[in-house]
Amino acid sequence: RAPAQLANASAAIAALRALLPVLAISDAAIADGVRSARLAGRMQVLPGPVEIVLDVAHNPQAAQQLAVWLGANRPRGANLAVFAALADKDVANEVAALMAHIDLWYLAGLADVGGRGQPVEQLWQKVGSLLSRSLATRHATVVQALAAARKSARAGDRIVVFGSFHTVGEALAALAPAA
């Protein structure tokens, strides 16, 4: 789990402890809850010959946390990123935070989400200069980008899907039989 998740769990435990006079919660129940807590798309790891990591990471701070985790958990092979983000996000700094950890980029567009979606060409205009030395491909949708990444991945590689709840949601839907 990422450091931010541990900090969040610590804050939740502190809040529970403050409520102990009102709520009868045992230490064992708290520990059980922390061990079993899961949120789809937040540092979600799907093991396999090609591991898939799904993390919303929709701002530079979250991308930095993902970078820390990737740095501490290197795959045997390459890290392939599937990235799509909403138009109003700081995508340049999200990409910059992860550049040292990603070997191949699969950029994708997002359907219009309340006026905030963006086509892949708009995303490319914002991050293309950062990726000029990296191998980056552009795809109309997250599903297409994920399919391309899965097709090129080899055993020992990892696919990292990030950028928004919409990005991860589309990927999870495409992976439904595997997830």
Task: Give residue ranges: language-model regions.
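Nucleotide phosphate-binding/pyrophosphate-handling subdomain across enzymes
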Residues: 1-104
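Nuclease catalytic cores that cleave nucleic-acid phosphodiester bonds
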Residues: 176
